[in-house]
Structure formats: structure tokens, C-alpha cells
Curated annotation (Swiss-Prot):
It catalyses: (2R)-2-phosphoglycerate = (2R)-3-phosphoglycerate. Its EC number is 5.4.2.11. It holds the Pfam family His_Phos_1. The keyword Isomerase applies. GO terms for molecular function: phosphoglycerate mutase activity. One of its GO terms (biological process) is glycolytic process. This is 2,3-bisphosphoglycerate-dependent phosphoglycerate mutase. Pathway: Carbohydrate degradation; glycolysis; pyruvate from D-glyceraldehyde 3-phosphate: step 3/5. SUPFAM superfamilies: Phosphoglycerate mutase-like. Substrate binds at residues 8-15, 21-22, 60, 87-90, 98, 114-115, 183-184. The gene is gpmA. The lineage of its organism: Bacteria, Pseudomonadati, Chlorobiota, Chlorobiia, Chlorobiales. The record marks H182 as: Transition state stabilizer. Keywords: Gluconeogenesis, Glycolysis, Isomerase. It is an enzyme of class 5 (isomerase). It comes from Pelodictyon phaeoclathratiforme (strain DSM 5477 / BU-1).
Amino acid sequence: MIKLVLLRHGESQWNRENRFTGWYDIDLTDQGREEAANAGKLLREGGFVFDVAYTSVLKRAIRTLWSVLDAMDLMWIPVFKSWRLNERHYGALQGLNKSETSQKYGEEQVLVWRRSYDTPPPALEKSDERYPGSEPRYADLAEEEIPLSECLKDTVDRFLPIWHETIAPEIRKGRKVIIAAHGNSLRALVKYLDNISEEDIVGVNIPTGIPLVYELDDDLNALRSYYLGDQEALKKAVDAVASQGKASQ
């Protein structure tokens, strides 16, 4: 039986401030660093080892992976970074407070932007200072690959090529893999692995800093999945993610 570990980065500063983060390169909070270290401890105590790791090009995911590998004494394994594992791009919402945005546009509209499958938020203009095309880390991308806004469908379409062409072949070779990424890029993979419908993916929330273990058969079909750690704390963390888009009372 094959085990694949998925890990959303620890709490970032904009998670704490309840902002749409997207491709903005915000760092972890102290709590986020603690979550990452604890994830590494849980994995070590659970007897997990890894041969190769994958992450995005955003520091909150990279630093989370560093902390995990440090806690497991695995900092020597190969780490591959790709923009394809980045968070979903939130377009013109990036940097805005989620509760304030809900007050302005309504909770239902913000839920659609946050969690629907095929409705992207309002797009950025290329002249906007938040447009990622001017950043050196994306210099090798074609202009059409750099998003102005993304829905989850766009994120799935961005993520699956690296899964099929790079990650899945490594797993089939017998390599033990961890993917440290973001809430929506991981939701994209979870949707694929569990064959979740476009309607049901709306209700899937992935908490920060808690390892999600997938057990796969030889054809990489999902047999079951589960989170490591305290289940009561897990429920609170999932509920907290679900409530982020609600208007402040």
C-alpha cells in the first residue's frame, strides 16, 4: 500500500488577518511555524519517511516544508518547487479582508468566489502592482500561464500536469512523497484523488499545518484518507477555515 502525505502550510500572517492571500508571498506567523514543526513531529512519531518532497514557490509553503523535514531529520532529501503548486490566484480580491469583503458583496457571493468550482473572482489588471508577471520567480513562464484570477477549475488544470508528469511517476517508482502546498492547490488534488463532484468540493476545507495522509493502491486510486493528530483540534481547525468568509457581526 502506498502512502502520500499532503500538508497545507502553517498559519500565515494573512491567514491570521483573514485576508485573501493567493500568490502574495506572505510568511508564517509564530503559530504557523509551531504548526509546521508539530506536523513534522507527528509524521516522525507516526513512522513516516520521505524520499522526495514537492512544494510551491511561496515562502509559507517552503518554510513549512523546511520545518517538517528538519523535525524528521530529512533536510537532505530532494525538494522540488513549482509555481503549479501555488495557491489559487484570488485576482482583485488578493489582500482584501474576507469578512469586510463579505459585508460589501454578501456572504453568498464571497462563498462562491472562495469555494465554487468554476467562478473566478474579479480579475487583476496587468498594470496592478499585485500582478505576478513582474516577479523574477515567474520569469520563465509564458504570459498566458500567469493568472489574473483563478477559480478552482483553473487551479486543477494548473496542478494536474505536474501530478501526472512528475509526482505520480515518482510514486510509481516506489518513492515516498510529501507535498507541502496551499489550501486550494491541495483541494484541487483532493478533488482529483477522491473524484469529488464540482458541487461537493465546495464543502471541503483543509486546515493549516495538519498532515493529511492518503492510502493509494498500485494504480494510485485512493483507498482512504485521514488526518494525523488530535481529532477535536482538527474539527476546530476545519470549522475555522469554513467560517473565514463570513461577515463580521
